[in-house]
Amino acid sequence: MNDTRPLLDRILSPRDLKKLSTKQLQQLADECRKELIELIAMNGGHFASSLGVTELTVALHHVYNTEEDRIVWDVGHQAYIHKMLTGRRSRMQTNRKYGGIAGFPKIHESPHDAFGTGHASTSISAAAGMAAGRDLKGGREKMVAVIGDGSMTGGMAFEAMNHLGDLKSDVLVILNDNQMAISPSTGGLKNHLVDITLNKTYNKARRLLWNSMSLLNHEGAKNALRRLEDGMKAALTPGAFFEALGLRYFGPIDGHDMGRLVRALKEMHELPNPKLLHVVTTKGKGFLPAEENQSGWHAHSGGFDTTTGMTAKKTGAPDPPKYQEIFGEALVEMALKDPAITAITAAMPSGTSLDLFEKAAPDRFYDVGIAEGHAVTFAAGLALEGLKPVCAIYSTFLQRALDQLIHDVALQNLHVVFAIDRAGLVGEDGPTHHGAFDLSFLHAVPGLTIMAPSDAQELRDMLHTALYHIEGPVAIRYPRGSSGGGPLRKDFTRLEPGRGRIIREGTGPVLFAIGSMVQAAVEAAALLEAEGIKPDIVDMRFLKPLDTALIDRLAASATHIVTIEENSILGGLGSAVSDHLASSPKKTPLLKIGLPDRFITHGSMQDLYRETGLDAAGIAEHVKEFYRTPVH
């Protein structure tokens, strides 16, 4: 890391920014930006968003006192500069690493982190709630919500602004408008948030007004024309929309002009009641590769040249395809033959690999923005029209649409396929993004078929089975990252709903595994065999309907039963098997292995599997201890 950061080296806390001049603040922003580029090149992490708000972050800490005032960073992946300036610079190299600082704001990590974030569109609600609490207590601290235009596509943001206008509390909403979320933002609001200088009607009328002013000598007439221009501008800018919600609107202003930012924030600091400052920024600002490919540089794994952005070419065998790629390619393969297949994403086309579908069948691809609830009910509408909607959504974000899944899809038994991406642990993004609960909350939904593939071919077959051989709603959950490779058939095989498969037969304990844990169970079995324990291994494939016939048959002769899942230990496969066997006359000892009943931290997948006991060694140790413990 470069040590020539004369201003940044002097910043031990945000208080050190208070006496800096505008010129010094800009120098500090430049130093922060350079350090961030070096940091991400070394360790990886979220990138382009923090580059885009560097000046804004410095200006906020110059004007506000985050030991008392509250700044809520929506989503939170743009808060790296904030962390540098709030006493965590020396720990930034541990960012997102096991035992290190988190990649998102966390209230237990620093008093300067006002609210824990990770999901989109929550900041205004949190700031409004804190403002209401402040008002009840007679406090004077300031509340600020920093939200991007991508997060503004989420309905929760509008619910909060609608309420905030009614509360009339002193809250500043800063709209960071970079025309992007992770991928380019979607919808009517994006089109509304266009710089007024690009509006042809406004510019034509403005030229006419200024030409008229040049002919006038009367100052009163000139002032009247200026007021007319202001009124016209208000009618054509987003201000009219936000003002209708009860927020005073200011802007848009250049989010990279330090002087304008500081002046505007100082003005906002003194104004009562809710207001919105519209700041226009460039995602990836200051690093040309990120400016030119903002989606591609939203986050990076590191190892790139800090000038060119080039990464060293990998040598050796190529990486196996990711589950996301297998899903996207299989869906396109079927969609090219079936015009009824449609695809829906909530602002994550590239993350889910639905960008492949968008290129192949753009007229049947729908990016609804950060609006998971709408995505699910929209899919329900498509299903009622006889189409085959596939809604690809991260497990952690599906939590936001559970009501719609139950009420609008399952209750009507509509044929919607949910491709649940990032199921299980996701690594460095941590507890806000782990998909730890989907088997549990989906298990209780009547009529919902739930599947989990153990490899790439099973994912292809499950997607085909879901689209063509199952009626009603279907959920397929699969993990982030590598599918493990292996040959893929060109055709698809129908899987019998509610039927598992025995992978290997043994003599003693039976390991019932599902999804990503099937391979882990196979590896654990190899370790157990060295200890003289030879278990049966079952790939359950389906959580619902559960293969009770296979469970009963194996339980009849099993000495011990073990369930293994990359899901909360509560409510998933272990609970389903335990509930089923509860009425069995034979009481076979049962061990449930899964994610413990707590939120799992961030870190590498290897670290997290080791901590939770879901790596092969951990599973083998659990089974060995269970198998050798006398039954009373």
Curated annotation (Swiss-Prot):
Binding-site list for Mg(2+): 149, 178
How cofactor binds (record note)? Binds 1 Mg(2+) ion per subunit. Binds 1 thiamine pyrophosphate per subunit.
Gene Ontology biological process: 1-deoxy-D-xylulose 5-phosphate biosynthetic process; isopentenyl diphosphate biosynthetic process, methylerythritol 4-phosphate pathway; terpenoid biosynthetic process; thiamine biosynthetic process
- Asked whether the UniProt record includes Metal-binding among its keywords, one would answer yes
Keywords of this protein's UniProt record, alphabetized? Isoprene biosynthesis, Magnesium, Metal-binding, Thiamine biosynthesis, Thiamine pyrophosphate, Transferase
- HAMAP family recorded for this chain? DXP_synth
Q: What is this protein called?
A: 1-deoxy-D-xylulose-5-phosphate synthase
Q: Which gene encodes it?
A: dxs
